């Protein structure tokens, strides 16, 4: 089965880059055997959920203090703690992703470096490493490749 441009428009009505996404998906989906209605639906649904309809390709961590307490209560137990991180995405990433998913501690900067990116919002040094290994590149190259792809996908 092939995903048509019209189907993609119906699934992603607010996305201004349908032509580019359709071209990319038409080339890549068959390579990964995403070729049945069920597989295509699952893939598109997961990616659309993670990326806000194929629009946000880098995790948005620009939270107000009140939201930090609600969304990340494990890390922000009270509003006073959250205020120190409010509207500081890099600092937030380094706190919430510290010492997990292969990342170092908060001071390592790994949380920010390996924050969610791409349609699936790949997150964490371990996941970047697995992704990089599948492409025979280093995690740092995967980070640069992801950043480059995310910033240029609409200009191709």
Say what each PLM segment does:
Residues 59-68, 122:
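Short, surface-exposed glycine/acidic/tryptophan-bearing loops
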Residues 2-48, 69-89:
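Export/targeting segments at the very N-terminus of extracytoplasmic proteins
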Residues 32-39, 108-114, 144-146:
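Structural motif
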Residues 147-151:
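Conserved small/polar residues in nucleotide/adenosyl-binding loops
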Residues 54-61, 133-134:
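Short, solvent-exposed loop/turn and secondary-structure capping segments
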Residues 39-54, 86-103, 122:
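Short, functionally critical alpha-helical segments immediately adjacent to catalytic or ligand/cofactor-binding
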Residues 110-136:
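A structural motif
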Residues 6-9, 128-146:
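Substrate-binding clefts and substrate-entry loops adjacent to catalytic sites
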């Amino acid at each position: 089965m092939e995903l048509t441009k019209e189907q993609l428009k119906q699934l992603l009505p607010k996305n201004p880059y349908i032509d580019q996404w359709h071209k990319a998906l038409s080339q890549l989906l068959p390579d990964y055997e995403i070729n049945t209605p069920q597989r295509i639906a699952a893939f598109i649904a997961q990616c659309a959920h993670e990326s806000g309809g194929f629009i946000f390709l880098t995790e948005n961590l620009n939270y107000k203090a009140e939201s930090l307490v609600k969304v990340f209560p494990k890390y922000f137990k009270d509003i006073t703690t959250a205020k120190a991180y409010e509207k500081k995405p890099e600092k937030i990433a380094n706190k919430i992703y510290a010492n997990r998913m292969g990342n170092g501690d908060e001071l390592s900067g790994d949380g920010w470096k390996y924050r969610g990116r791409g349609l699936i919002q790949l997150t964490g040094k371990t996941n970047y490493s697995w992704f990089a290994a599948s492409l025979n590149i280093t995690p740092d190259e995967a980070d640069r490749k992801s950043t480059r792809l995310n910033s240029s996908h609409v200009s191709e």
